[in-house]
Structures are given as structure tokens and as C-alpha cells.
Design a protein with these regions (language model features):
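Nucleotide/phosphate-binding catalytic cleft detector across ATP-hydrolyzing
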Residues: 1-150, 163-275
Length: 275
């Protein structure tokens, strides 16, 4: 007798997370694939990410998703098939999967998701909006008739949802996230320290030293190319510089999204509660 395995999949532009029903088995890998000569897959997930920005001309390492939408369905399907193999065994074949999808998908984008998922060796597929999945994951009262707001800052997008009675009553998705913050760090380091760094270095600086309000004052030595001399160089970057760069991005974009969500659409929540 074969036991049916059930697992949830969180498809992000930067990371793919897969967990079983009891959360005992979890896979968390970078959503990235490395391909040689546009034909041969040589690495997926974290191994492909380690090759990012270091590959020769014949190898490309990139994510098959951009801004929460599928850019290369074939490569995304290959990554998912590889990762789902970790949930299969002699006694568990063709699992049931629940997949989170972004808000405000167009019909074409939704068909792209279905095409990728139906190509996997799975038994049943269910889709759930990211806002609802986020709220359930952090233990919010999603079935209550009161509104609960969830803000998910991803790599490429920021999703803002108001959940009530198990549904997304208000949902907005904005095309900026951690990648925009990383670009702000790259720009700041180039402008203030005359040093050119890559995205991976900027991400490490943001994660290690970035804060939006109050945080510990520290610094980190980073290496890159001097923008004037063109030779390898280094600079000590204080956490204040990192935090100012990402705070400016958050103030200009994320808070604007919150204000838009609150001021424009809260009347929909009141209408839903009175219906």
C-alpha cells in the first residue's frame, strides 16, 4: 500500500520552500538553475546560487521567476521536480501539493503556473493565495471576521493583504522588495566608497547589518573593484550607511503601499463585514 504524501510549496523569486504536512521535513533552496550552452543543466538550488556571478561565458545561472511571475517554465519545472524527489520514497509516490501563488496574477500568468505544476509527477494540485498562506503560517486568526493585515517583503515583490473570514479582502502587490534594497546598497557603496560590488555581497551586507529603525552600530570589510583605479580594493562599510540606503527604499515604496492599501480600500473590508 502506498501512503499519500502531502506537502506545501512556497514559490518565491529568490527561494523555494517545501514542507510536509507535519513540518518535519523541510526543503529550502535558492530558486536558481545553472545551464551550460543553453542545454545542459549542471546545478540547481543552492549549488547554482554559489555559481552566480562566477560563471564562465558558456554557463548562465539565473532564476526562472521574475517579479513573482514565471519567466522560464521549463527551468522552473526542472527545479521543482528535483526538489520534490526528496519527498518521494518506495512507500510514497506522487504527493498531493499545495502551492502558494502571488496576488493579482493575469490569466496568462496563472496558465503558466498551471502548465508548470501539471507537468510534475504529483497526484493533486491546490493553489492558495500567498496572503492567506502567510497568515496561516504565522498563526493569525484567518477565519475571524475581523481584519488582519499581512505584509510580505519578498525578493522581487512586496505583498500587502488584509485577511478576513478566510479570504483576502484587500490585496496589493508592488514590484519591489529585497532586490531593490540590494541595488540601493550597491549604489550607496559605489557613491560613498568608490567601490563596485556584486548583488551577493550587497545581500550579505543587508542581512548582516541592515535595520530600519534602531540597531547595533557595527561595520564590515568588503571587497570589490575600485571605480576610479579599476583595481581590486576594499572598504569598511558602517551599518549606518547600509541602514540609510535600505530605509530610504522602504520609506519611499513600502510605506507608500501601506498607505495606499489603508486609505483606498478599507471601505471594502467594512462592506464585507456588514454584508
Amino acid at each position: 500500500m502506498l501512503f499519500r504524501k502531502k506537502c506545501g510549496i512556497d514559490l518565491g523569486s529568490d527561494t523555494i520552500k517545501i514542507a510536509d504536512k507535519k513540518n518535519k521535513k523541510v526543503v529550502c533552496e535558492k530558486n536558481m538553475i545553472a545551464v551550460r550552452d543553453k542545454t545542459y543543466v549542471i546545478a540547481v538550488g543552492q549549488r547554482a546560487y554559489e555559481m552566480y556571478e562566477k560563471t564562465p561565458l558558456c554557463v548562465t545561472a539565473d532564476s526562472p521567476m521574475v517579479d513573482g511571475a514565471i519567466a522560464d517554465g521549463g527551468n522552473l519545472g526542472f527545479i521543482l521536480a528535483r526538489l520534490l524527489k526528496r519527498f518521494s520514497s518506495v512507500f510514497t509516490k506522487r504527493p498531493d501539493i499545495l502551492v502558494t501563488v502571488p496576488m493579482e496574477l493575469s490569466e496568462i500568468e496563472m496558465r503558466a503556473f498551471y502548465k508548470v505544476l501539471t507537468g510534475l509527477k504529483v497526484r493533486r494540485i491546490a493553489l492558495v493565495e500567498k496572503g492567506v498562506a502567510d497568515a496561516v503560517g504565522i498563526g493569525m486568526p484567518v477565519l475571524a471576521q475581523t481584519g488582519s493585515m499581512v505584509v510580505n517583503i519578498g525578493a522581487s515583490t512586496t505583498g500587502i493583504s488584509v485577511i478576513s473570514d478566510g479570504k483576502v479582502i484587500i490585496g496589493r502587490q508592488y514590484p519591489y522588495g529585497g532586490n531593490a534594497m540590494d541595488q540601493a546598497v550597491i549604489t550607496m557603496v559605489r557613491r560613498e566608497h568608490n567601490l563596485a560590488i556584486g548583488k551577493k555581497t550587497a545581500e550579505k551586507l543587508r542581512v548582516a547589518m541592515g535595520y530600519l529603525m534602531n540597531g547595533e552600530a557595527k561595520s564590515s570589510e568588503v571587497y570589490g573593484i575600485h571605480t576610479i583605479s579599476g583595481v581590486p580594493s576594499s572598504a569598511r562599510i558602517p551599518s549606518e550607511d547600509i541602514s540609510k540606503a535600505i530605509t530610504d527604499t522602504a520609506d519611499a515604496k513600502h510605506y507608500a503601499g501601506l498607505n495606499d492599501c489603508q486609505s483606498t480600500d478599507l471601505r471594502k473590508l467594512e462592506f464585507h463585514r456588514n454584508a
